[in-house]
């Protein structure tokens, strides 16, 4: 069983994300629990929280199939302490929101060194802040996302994720999300069966499938190993459709959210149907 959906809008209240997921025939989804381009947001209302939980139950969604994403502003590895602290406080707020909604995961981009400190120093700061955040919150698993390596973003090598995980004290609360467009742009090929197996074996050896808590399912406008982050609709980009068949037929990827962040929301329902059609081939 795979939880297939898209990153749906929660505009007008988090409960609307559930309705939007239902509308596209999803059995999993991603959402922002607040405006992703603002540092501070009003707390979630009791009414919104209850309605969200009610709709989740009514439509048969479970927490295992939902992958909330934090704000793009947050940088846990920021070289400047005051800005890092601002990011940390926003991150903890995001985790608490997820926990209020009864969800399990918070997906986030590891962080950026902004060309002011070394990669290792930045990875140490990220690890330190994750450890702090785990102590300051209750139970949610914090899910590091693979990145394309654009600019000074870390997370474009499996080794970056492994380094962070190694430094986490409570490993039951850390995980990883593979974004297909990002890994492809970072130089991990998945276009043929052989390339896919090689990349997944590398992931397993360096990070470990036990840490895989979700995937972002995207084709790529950017060329292989370009270190450029540009998503495309399935089969229309540089990756091609076969990679998504391999994913849907891979039992190591069962029971986690597979979330579309492709560029044409109007065809998400079709893309979900397409992915599900690959599952039992």
UniProtKB/Swiss-Prot annotation:
- What is the cofactor note? Binds 3 Zn(2+) ions.
Q: Which GO terms describe its biological process?
A: base-excision repair
Q: Tell whether Lipid biosynthesis is among the UniProt keywords.
A: no
Q: Identify the residues that bind Zn(2+) 2.
A: 145, 179, 216, 261
Chain sites annotated for binding Zn(2+) 3 = 182, 229, 231
GO MF assignments: deoxyribonuclease IV (phage-T4-induced) activity; DNA binding; DNA-(apurinic or apyrimidinic site) endonuclease activity; phosphoric diester hydrolase activity; zinc ion binding
Q: Which Pfam families match?
A: AP_endonuc_2 (PF01261)
SMART domains in the record:
AP2Ec
Q: What is its EC number?
A: 3.1.21.2
Q: Which keywords are on file for this protein? A: DNA damage, DNA repair, Endonuclease, Hydrolase, Metal-binding, Nuclease, Zinc
Annotated Gene3D superfamilies: Divalent-metal-dependent TIM barrel enzymes (3.20.20.150)
Residues annotated as binding Zn(2+) 1 are 69, 109, 145
Is Metal-binding one of the keywords UniProt gives this record? yes
User: What catalytic reaction does the record list?
Assistant: Endonucleolytic cleavage to 5'-phosphooligonucleotide end-products
Q: Which domain of life is it from?
A: Bacteria
Q: Which InterPro entries match?
A: AP_endonuc_2, AP_endonuc_F2_Zn_BS, Xyl_isomerase-like_sf, Xyl_isomerase-like_TIM-brl
Q: Which cofactor does it need?
A: Zn(2+)
Q: Which HAMAP family match?
A: Nfo
Family note: Belongs to the AP endonuclease 2 family.
Entry function: Endonuclease IV plays a role in DNA repair. It cleaves phosphodiester bonds at apurinic or apyrimidinic (AP) sites, generating a 3'-hydroxyl group and a 5'-terminal sugar phosphate.
Q: What is this protein called?
A: Probable endonuclease 4
Please name the source species.
Nautilia profundicola (strain ATCC BAA-1463 / DSM 18972 / AmH)
Q: Give the gene symbol.
A: nfo
